[in-house]
Amino acid sequence: LSDHGADVVFCARNADAVSELSSYSEGAGSVSGIVADMGDQSSTEEFISDVLSGGDVDLLINNVGASPSRNFLYMKDEDWTELHELNLMSAVRCTRAFLPAMREKKWGRVLMISSSAGKYPNAALVDYGTTKAAMISMGKSLARKYGSDGVLINSILPGLIHTAMWERAAGEIAEASGRTAEEVISNNGKGVPVGRYGTSEEVASLIVFLCSNAASYINGTAIEVDGGQASHL
């Protein structure tokens, strides 16, 4: 988005990650980061306040999430609550805070970065998939409500995307199965029709499009970025 002229404000829990990404200067727009924990209500509200102190928001990308793999029967209420706060309530709070100014200006974009797990349930990711399905539902509901105000709200459902999170997951699987992380990633990629994992840049390209005026009639959709892995009509 910065490459296309947007002034970007983001947050992350890791101060080093915030510092590294904030140093990006190749785009036409600025990039600034704030250390915040989207799984904590007060931290999220402080982040929102900091952002609004710099002016209104035209584009909101709800891109937060953790996807622990765990057994449903051994999960406690706290496990569900913590992931619900991080994955879903962060999007609820940010959307609620930034939407009014978009409505007033009669222009805005909100994107829910959900997951293919929100549409195709996986028992090992039951809590993650539940929160991501809720994001899709919220996006669809709000799109129907606020589309007439010029605010377009859509969801993006990434499939297998080669990220640091997947690197860690592959490492855990490799350790448990006696393989290397590279072998795990390669084997998983074979299950995708294009034969590989996707990249963050390929997801970002869709984000840029949906935030542009070229997507002025796209509202309430849930678009999969999965290399053709989904088999439904």
Show where each model-derived region lies.
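Conserved glycine-rich Rossmann-like NAD(P)H-binding loop of the short-chain dehydrogenase/reductase
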Residues: 6-20
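Substrate-binding pocket helix/loop in short-chain dehydrogenase/reductase
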Residues: 71-72, 79-84, 188
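Active-site helix of classical SDR
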Residues: 95, 131, 139
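Alpha-helical segment proximal to the catalytic Tyr-Lys
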Residues: 100, 144-145, 216
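Residue(s) in the substrate-gating loop at a strand-loop-helix junction
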Residues: 115
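Short C-terminal tail/terminal secondary-structure segment
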Residues: 120, 196, 208, 219-233
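Short, small/polar-rich loop/turn modules that mediate ligand/substrate recognition or access, typified
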Residues: 147, 152, 218-220
